[in-house]
Regions:
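Conserved catalytic core of nucleotide-sugar-dependent glycosyltransferases
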Residues: 80-144
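GT-A fold catalytic core of metal-dependent nucleotide-sugar glycosyltransferases
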Residues: 47-96, 120
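N-terminal anchoring/stem segment of glycosyltransferases
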Residues: 1-47, 54-57, 197-220
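Short alpha-helical segments and helix-capping/turn motifs at coil-helix boundaries
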Residues: 6-7, 48-49, 103-104, 165-167
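Short, solvent-exposed polar/charged micro-motifs at secondary-structure junctions
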Residues: 28-34, 98-101, 166-171
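Short, surface-exposed amphipathic charged segments that create phosphate/polyanion-binding patches used
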Residues: 33-39, 101-106, 173-176
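A glycosyltransferase accessory/donor-loop signature
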Residues: 13-15, 21-24, 118-220
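Short secondary-structure capping/junction motifs at helix and strand boundaries
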Residues: 16-17, 61-64, 69-70, 127-131
Length: 220
């Protein structure tokens, strides 16, 4: 899923993108991350909050879960940065009915669920500079994901089209149209997942482009 997500970002972008994956083993080896994996739904459940530290608290950064698929140029999203805000995200009113999600993990219910699944992070904001290694490794999931470390006025809003929760937002219910799909209820390979074919089409296109590059390299 990570590869398809990255491909979709680059496919639509007119500019070069600096994309890095949060790899938990590497972060642990550098002694930046030491939380036990117990009760985490993914390996990046908490590592996303290391981004300001990794950026040396400079500039802006964007985070998204790896089960995203971008349908438009992310430059449009990045243009929504606002230096008066610490974090900018889609403020979902999302309360899933399912008790179990992907990989048989418990579907934890908490306020502001999925707000942190896509974030524009102002790494230079004073409150963001408080997000240090101790906070990321020791504070509760609710504290981090509900942005309890921020004042409400420091959290900016994004259109939900950029974090379109598949099977939650619906074009046929007047929710508009997606700019970025988020397969939050499970991977896009799940049988009843809306937009499954869209994801598979991007995967196929990625594989075709990769094969074309390999063929070109061999022919030289």
């Amino acid at each position: 899923a990570s590869k398809v997500c990255e491909f979709s970002l680059r496919h639509h972008s007119k500019e070069d993108l600096d994309i890095s994956l949060l790899k938990t083993p590497a972060l642990k080896k550098k002694k930046l991350y030491w939380r036990p994996y117990k009760n985490q739904s993914t390996q990046f459940t908490y590592t996303r909050f290391l981004i300001p530290y990794l950026q040396k608290y400079k500039g802006w950064a964007m985070y998204c879960d790896n089960d995203f698929l971008f349908l438009n140029d992310v430059k449009e999203l990045l243009s929504l940065q606002n230096n008066s805000k610490a974090v900018i995200c889609v403020k979902h009113e999302y309360k899933p009915k399912e008790k179990i999600k992907m990989d048989n993990k418990k579907q934890t219910q908490f306020e502001r669920k999925n707000w942190s699944s896509l974030m524009l992070i102002n790494c230079e904001h004073p409150d963001v500079k408080d997000v240090d290694l101790s906070m990321v490794n020791e504070e509760s999931g609710e504290y981090l994901h509900q942005f309890d470390w921020l004042n409400d006025e420091d959290i900016g809003s994004l259109p939900h089209s950029w974090n379109w929760l598949v099977n939650w937002y619906r074009t046929d219910k007047g929710d508009g149209h997606p700019d970025a799909l988020h397969f939050t209820e499970g991977g896009p390979w799940i049988a009843d997942s809306e937009y499954k074919q869209t994801w598979l089409n991007y995967k196929k296109l990625m594989e075709e482009e990769n094969e074309s590059k390999r063929t070109t390299t061999i022919s030289r």
